[in-house]
Each structure stands twice: as C-alpha cells, then as structure tokens.
C-alpha cells in the first residue's frame, strides 16, 4: 500500500514517526517546522518524501512506495482470511472484516484460496496455502511481508478449522514459529474446534458456557498458551458445528461429523450410515431416526453456507482485528 496525497491512518502515523526520528534534519514541513504527526499525508509529508527520494537516488514523485516502507521497516500489517466450505475467498464474514480494515488503511488484506469444495474436507490444502503465504517475505502481488511484520488471521467454519490447524501445526509447534511473535490477532467464527467455554463477549447469541466445537476431542486450546489474549472465538448458539457438549450425545455428534467431513468414504449417505452404526456400536432401533436426522443435518451444514452467520462482519470482530496494527 503506497502513501500519497490524501492518505491517512495508522500507517501514515508510523511513517511520520520514523521520519522524525531518523531524518530530523529534513523532516520539516513547508513552514520549516517539524512534521506534525496527525496521521494525514499532505503537502508537508510529500515534501519530506521527495527529499528522501532525492537522497536515495529515486524518481522524486513524493509517493511512499512499498519498497520505501520495507526499507524503513514499515511493512503494513497483513490480515489473512480463510472462508468456509464451498466459499468464495473474496466474500464472507472474514473477507468483509479485512476488506473494511484495508479500506481504512489499517492493514493489507490477503485472502487465502484452498480446496473448499470437497467433501470430505481437504483442510490440508488450506494449511499448505497458508504455510506458503505466511512463510514468504513477499506476497503474490509483491506486497512486502518481511520478518517482523505484524499480522493476523480470520477463519470461518471450515476455514476456522484450517486456521486452527495452521496455528497449531505451523506457528505454535512448527517451522513457522518465527512468525509467532508478530501474530497480533487471530479470530475464528463458527469453529468446529472451538475451545470449551471460549466465546467473545460481543456474540449476539452466545452459546452455553459448558460447550465447545463439534470436534470435542480436538478443541483448539489457546488458554494458558502464548496465544491467550491474541486469539478469539465468536460463536452463535444453535450452530451445530461450533456448539457441542462433552458427553455421550456430544461424542456421537463428533463421530458423525468426523466421518462426514474428514474420513474417506464412497457410496453416499447409505455408506455413511453404515460406518456410523459400526462406530457407535449397538444402537437401539428407536435411536436410528435420530441418528439419521443428525447425519442429514451435518451433511447439510457441511455442504451449504452456514445459516447461523451473517455475511457481514460484526462490529466487535472488526474492532478485535483492528488491533493487528496496535
């Protein structure tokens, strides 16, 4: 993101601060006084940038380029977004959040494409895509992402599973742990791996405190870790994927969800039903309709946009991610 006449926001403030500290002799406005750090890029700032360009043998256009920002250690914070099953990476609650913050000059938005149309899920493709992006020092369009750049991540539904797997396998305990110190914010929406009892206070329909994601035995625990205070979970009560109980009924839901979303299977719902019965053991006849209904419900949620979430990011989610630039 370049800075030019009319630019405003946190990045302009950071640039002004660096110029005042490092180039005090010429970080002066047209009136000869030191630049005023008001977060606005005007004629005073343009004058200083042209002098910087002259001294660094560049064309003197008064525009702070991505290359200049990188040279000054001012690469813009990056927000990665991972939408849900059968999604378009450019649209959804994650995309809306990051798009708005990019428009406000807070951060640069990098959507993440992965194989989101498969059932069973192909979460590994999302983890690999994130590993390639976060592990690089330059994003695909040339945006600088050097070590030390603040960054954040948002995931929704299947994308929340991808984000959780990525943070768990690559950032907390993996080859990209060098990015951990610069991870400022992570946010999961409707996460099947939601930690039990963890939910943001601004959820419009908060779940019961003694619930977690449908993947009961694979909850993404951040409490007591280095991510505590940096990771948030937003969940709406009634979302089968992110609201489950740690009891026999909850374990049955987890088993069915695991078979549908993660295991290899062929033969449609009949094959799934056979595998579920084999997994659950002796099932009384009167329980079969309930199991069938549960399979149908999870199949529907796995194959369709989640009905429990709007496609517009909530204010609390946006403000949480805004701190990526703090």
Where are these regions (language model features)?
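Short acidic, glycine/serine/threonine-rich helix-capping segments at coil-helix boundaries
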Residues: 2-71
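Extracytoplasmic/secreted envelope proteins and their assembly/folding machinery
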Residues: 12-16, 46, 69, 94, ...
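Gly/Ala-rich beta-loop-alpha elbow adjacent to hydrolase catalytic centers
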Residues: 153-164
